[in-house]
């Protein structure tokens, strides 16, 4: 899980999903599980 300032590059990756949990924005990817990130 990476912590990034901007998730715009990660959300363009195929299979990416934007999820809001506990007031934070996450990117999860079922096709490529290494592409996980949280903003802030």
Curated annotation (Swiss-Prot):
Task: Cite a single GO BP annotation.
Answer: translation
Instruction: Report the GO terms under cellular component.
Output: ribonucleoprotein complex; ribosome
Keywords tagged on the record:
Ribonucleoprotein, Ribosomal protein
- Superkingdom of origin: Bacteria
**Protein biosynthesis among the record's keywords?**
no
Question: Would you indicate the residue range of the signal peptide?
Answer: none
Q: Name one GO molecular function term.
A: structural constituent of ribosome
User: Which protein family is it in?
Assistant: Belongs to the bacterial ribosomal protein bL36 family.
NCBIfam families associated with the record: PRK00831.1 (NF002021)
Entry protein name: Large ribosomal subunit protein bL36A
């Amino acid at each position: 899980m990476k912590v990034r300032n901007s998730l715009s590059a990660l959300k363009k990756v195929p299979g990416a999903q934007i999820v809001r949990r506990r007031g934070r924005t996450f990117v999860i990817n079922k096709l490529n599980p290494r592409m996980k990130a949280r903003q802030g």
